[in-house]
Structure formats: structure tokens, C-alpha cells
Regions:
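Sec-dependent signal peptide recognition
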Residues: 2-9
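Short beta-strand segments that buttress and anchor functional surface loops
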Residues: 41-42, 92-99, 124-126
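Mid-length scaffold segments of soluble, non-membrane domains
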Residues: 70-115
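Hydrophobic h-region of N-terminal signal peptides that target proteins for export
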Residues: 10-18
Length: 198
């Protein structure tokens, strides 16, 4: 009973202090890493490196959002995801493969979905969960946070924006971060597009 109360207290604190990207605004100063079919940029926000990849897909918003909100299917869509386990209705544990020689990464997130007239968002922040203790060979991304934002351009085209905390922790060298962020942004958009073509 006492342990349960302690875990609830820790979880509550974690939710209060979790990184929330909703404060990012259009006045934010961004550094462009790539500007072609997929634009990728980065900024500092609350002392964290925040990245954003953006593109236009020739598909309806509803079709794209169905793929993004199906978190259990992530290993079949986003190929670096090796495991995606739903812990609660809005909490998921995600494990990622990293290129050799780096350790894998994992994170537990709580997500919220919002639907507006012509826009849809899927925002997430890191939490702790007793059913997902740290695993050997993986670095826990304790500040994981991000947002998918879909904005309908018309019935057949959608602007897709993916924003995430680019902090990789562990043994990942700072000099390789820009390259890692570009790779991640391109992979996420490529794999999402591929899944939508199936």
C-alpha cells in the first residue's frame, strides 16, 4: 500500500514536470538542417534540443491520423521501433534500435489527441510506469516529448509536422546530433508515407 502511494506520488510529479512542447510558438528561432521535400529544423526550448520535420503528403488527414494513433502497430510502420506495448489507454512503452555501436533507446509516454476543424494533433510526454522498468541494453529517454500535427490543405493533401525532443542521452556524441536529427526526421516521414501506400 505504501509503495503504491509512493509510485502514484512520483507519477504525479513526473506529469507536473514533464517536458511539454505546447509552448513552442511561431516566433521561436529555428536553425534549418534541411530544406527540400522534407524540411528539418532545430531549436532550443527549455534547454532541450527540439527538432521538427515537415512535409506534405498527398493523402487525406483522416487516413494519416489512423496510422499515427495506432501505436501498437509502430514496429510495422517506423522501422527503428522494435517494440511498442500499450500500458494503459493513453500510455505506451516504445523501444528503439540504434545504429551500431550505440545502445538502444526506450521511453514511456502519455499521449493526448485533439481534433479541430482542419487539424489533428497527437501530443506526448514522458511518464514513468511500474510495468516498464528500465531494460538492460537500453537508455531510457526520460524527457521524451513530441507532437504530430496534421493540417488539411484540401481533401487530398495534408501538411504533416513531427516535432520531438532530440536529446539522445547515453553515449551518443554531441558532434553527431545534427546528422542523427536529419536521419530521424527523414526516416519518420519516409516510413509514414510508405505505410500509407500499402
Amino acid at each position: 500500500m505504501k509503495l503504491t502511494k509512493i509510485l502514484l506520488f512520483i507519477s504525479s510529479l513526473n506529469m507536473i514536470y514533464a517536458l511539454d512542447l505546447s509552448g513552442l510558438n511561431s516566433n521561436q528561432e529555428w536553425k534549418t538542417l534541411q530544406n527540400n521535400d522534407v524540411s528539418i529544423k532545430t531549436t532550443q526550448y527549455l534547454e532541450f534540443p527540439i527538432c521538427r520535420a515537415e512535409t506534405i503528403l498527398s493523402l487525406p488527414l483522416k487516413t494519416i491520423s489512423a496510422i499515427i494513433e495506432n501505436v501498437e502497430n509502430y514496429p510495422n510502420v517506423f522501422l527503428r521501433v522494435t517494440k511498442s506495448r500499450v500500458l494503459e489507454d493513453d500510455v505506451v512503452h516504445i523501444m528503439l534500435d540504434m545504429p551500431f555501436p550505440f545502445s538502444g533507446r526506450d521511453y514511456i509516454i502519455k499521449y493526448i489527441k485533439h481534433k479541430f476543424s482542419s487539424a489533428w494533433t497527437f501530443r506526448f510526454s514522458a511518464v514513468e510506469h511500474e510495468q516498464a522498468p528500465p531494460e538492460k541494453g537500453h537508455v531510457r529517454l526520460i524527457h521524451a516529448a513530441g507532437e504530430w500535427k496534421l493540417t488539411a490543405i484540401n481533401d487530398l493533401e495534408t501538411n504533416v509536422s513531427y516535432t520531438w525532443n532530440g536529446e539522445l542521452l547515453g553515449d551518443f556524441p554531441n558532434w553527431a546530433l545534427d546528422r542523427a536529427w536529419k536521419t530521424q526526421g527523414n526516416e519518420m516521414m519516409e516510413w509514414l508515407n510508405d505505410a500509407l501506400q500499402d
